[in-house]
Amino acid sequence: MSICIKDQIQNMNIVIGCTVGCTYCYARNNVKCWHMIDDFADPEFFPGKLKMMEKKRPQNFLLTGMSDLSGWKPEWRDEVFAKIRENPQHQFLFLTKRPDLLDFDTDLENAWFGVTVTRKAELWRIDALRKNVRAKHYHVTFEPLFDDPGTVDLSGINWIVVGTMTGAQSRKIHTEPEWAWSLTDQAHKLGIPVFMKEDLVPIIGDENMIQEMPEEFNKVLEVQKSWKK
């Protein structure tokens, strides 16, 4: 039985808003529906949420579920990174679609920096990530997968996630199973874990789903089991 990635990784929306402007953005629709901020194209920082990092029970966190790291002001990033350093019990993930706008170094052991790639024409983002974000851990999310990315340079990448379009737009986009399998094979040849998101079940088949996590994330999940919520 496939698992939902949201059960493994918790959203912590410290920044809400994004300037990228994807036509299929679920975050923008949610913000508009619940009126979280006035203008989604003008990101806002919510430092009060940093207290969530102080909890002792380990957790895997995604910090850019409602934003893009490229839209964070440097001072926001510095404040968040400082808090991450104080809380090594957690693992933290960041995503961007504009790695070309980033330029920083970090030695954080529990921070993972990734790019979203939806088509072959966006493969440059992986190279830009490695060049512009000098970090310990990298990941790539191939979602929603619009076409065959072909041969991908995954050197230095520590995890990949593969998924397709969800929601109202899902009927307009069809991800071929061969694309997902090609990415999986390329990653596995380099020893990179692969997580197929649950929306691939109708395409891949539940019995064929591969849902692997980095060892650091698995350790967090194992420790969680010994804690009472």
Task: Mark where each language-model region is.
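Auxiliary Fe-S-binding modules of radical SAM enzymes
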Residues: M1-I9, F146, T151-K229
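Conserved Radical SAM active-site core
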Residues: M1-W112, K120-R134, P149-L154
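Hydrophobic faces of well-ordered beta-strands that scaffold small-molecule active sites
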Residues: F61-L63, F92-F94, F113-V115, Y138-F142, ...
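Active-site-proximal loop/turn and secondary-structure-junction residues that shape catalytic pockets
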Residues: S67, R98-D100, V117-R119, P144-F146, ...
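Nucleic-acid endo/exonuclease domains
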Residues: W72, F142, E176-P177
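Long, well-ordered alpha-helical scaffolding segments within enzyme catalytic domains
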Residues: E79-A82, L129-H137, H174-Q186
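Structural alpha-beta junctions
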Residues: E86-F92, R134-H137, T184-V194
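Short capping loops/turns at secondary-structure boundaries
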Residues: T118, E122, I173-E176
